[in-house]
A protein has these predicted regions:
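Short glycine-rich anion-binding loops that position phosphate/pyrophosphate groups of nucleotides
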Residues: 11, 62-64, 87, 171-172
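A residue-level signal for conserved active-site and pocket-lining positions in enzyme catalytic cores
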Residues: 9, 57, 61, 83, ...
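Catalytic core of DAGKc-family lipid kinases
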Residues: 87-162
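Redox-cofactor binding/interface segments in oxidoreductases and associated redox assembly factors
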Residues: 6, 58, 167
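Short glycine/serine/threonine-rich phosphate/pyrophosphate-binding segments
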Residues: 15, 64-69, 167-168, 175-177
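Gly/Ser/Thr-rich active-site loops/lids in small-molecule metabolic enzymes
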Residues: 158-200
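ATP/NTP phosphate-donor binding region
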Residues: 1-55, 95-111, 122-129
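Gly/Ser-rich helix-loop-strand patches that form or flank binding pockets
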Residues: 67, 72-85
């Protein structure tokens, strides 16, 4: 790997202290490293990632990693997440271990774990998108119920039109809930979320 690109969530690394540290560490090995410019608004940039990049690093939490994976859809680029969030089930490296992680990267001491992604579309609104973790179909109004047909790879799977169902989630083994029930398989789960009303007891 010769060229690296760092995507930073400025809500997590506000002064980019960790980001700059990673950049300097990469450059100390004679490699090139580019930092994504701060977005004009929001946490995530819409800038296209250069084509000649060999590896993308994210600095933030799992949300930063997931957002970056969507932007990289269709490109065969490895990603490594530096965890500055809370859970960190996708971001592999903790902040205190970044220098060792960079050393392993530039020396080629790593393995690449393939991840599947979902492609989803809503035909009636012509909406299409991709996801690393899950796609959720949910109602748009407080008094509306979910009613739709679900197709997977062009084949009809199920109809949803029940009052008790608030939304349906189609997820990969990268989803947070899937860490528990998928056990490193390619299992896809389609889960109904019932509508509950929780009230505090006095």
């Amino acid at each position: 790997m010769e060229k690296f690109y760092i995507i930073t969530n400025d809500m997590k690394d506000a002064n980019r202290k960790i980001t700059v540290k990673i950049k300097k560490c990469i450059e100390s090995y004679g490699k090139k490293c580019y930092l994504e410019e701060r977005p004009e608004e929001g946490n995530f940039s819409k800038i296209k990632i250069p084509k000649d990049i060999d590896c993308v690093l994210t600095v933030g939490g799992d949300g930063t990693f997931i957002q970056a994976s969507r932007r990289l859809f269709g490109r065969d680029l490895p990603m490594l997440g530096i965890n500055m969030g809370t859970l960190g089930y996708l971001t592999e490296v903790e902040v205190q271990n970044v220098e060792e992680a960079v050393k392993q990267l530039v020396e080629g001491n790593y393995t690449i774990e393939e991840r599947m992604m979902l492609y989803g579309s809503a035909a009636y609104r012509n909406v299409r998108d991709v996801a690393l973790n899950d796609i959720v179909m949910t109602r748009s109004g407080s008094m509306k119920i979910v009613h739709f047909n679900l197709y997977v790879n062009g084949e009809f799977l199920n109809s949803y039109g029940f009052y008790c169902v608030q939304s349906v989630c189609r997820r990969t083994d990268c989803g947070a809930d899937s860490v528990i029930d998928c056990c490193d398989t390619d299992l896809l789960a389609c889960t109904q979320f019932p509508q509950y009303c929780f009230r505090g007891q006095r």
